C-alpha cells in the first residue's frame, strides 16, 4: 500500500483499506485537484476582500470546480468525505 495515498485518504476521512492501489491513486489525484481548486478560490476570494479584484463570480466558479471533485468521489466510488459542500448532501440510497 502506498503510504502517501493512504495518508491523503485518511486526511479526508476515507478508509484506504477499502481500495486497491489504482483506486487510491485515482482518489488521491481527485483530492489533490480539489485542494488546488480550493486554494485558487480562497486566494481569489482574499483578493476580492482586499479590493484587488472586482467581483466577476470567478471565485464562485473556482469553488464550484473544487466542490465538483468531491461530488465526483461520491458519484464514482460512493465515497463521502469529511468535507461539507454548501447546498449538497450525498444521497445514501444511490449506492
Segment roles from a protein language model:
Residues 1-2, 67:
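Generic non-transmembrane alpha-helix signal with a bias for helix starts/N-cap capping motifs
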Residues 3-20:
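Short terminal alpha-helical segments
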Amino acid at each position: 500500500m502506498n503510504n502517501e495515498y493512504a495518508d491523503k485518504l485518511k486526511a479526508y476521512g476515507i478508509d484506504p483499506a477499502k481500495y486497491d492501489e489504482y483506486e487510491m491513486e485515482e482518489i488521491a489525484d481527485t483530492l489533490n485537484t480539489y485542494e488546488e481548486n480550493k486554494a485558487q478560490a480562497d486566494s481569489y476570494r482574499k483578493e476580492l476582500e482586499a479590493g484587488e479584484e472586482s467581483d466577476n463570480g470567478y471565485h464562485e466558479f473556482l469553488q464550484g470546480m473544487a466542490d465538483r471533485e468531491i461530488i465526483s468521489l461520491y458519484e464514482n466510488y460512493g465515497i463521502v468525505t469529511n468535507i461539507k459542500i454548501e447546498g449538497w448532501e450525498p444521497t445514501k440510497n444511490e449506492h
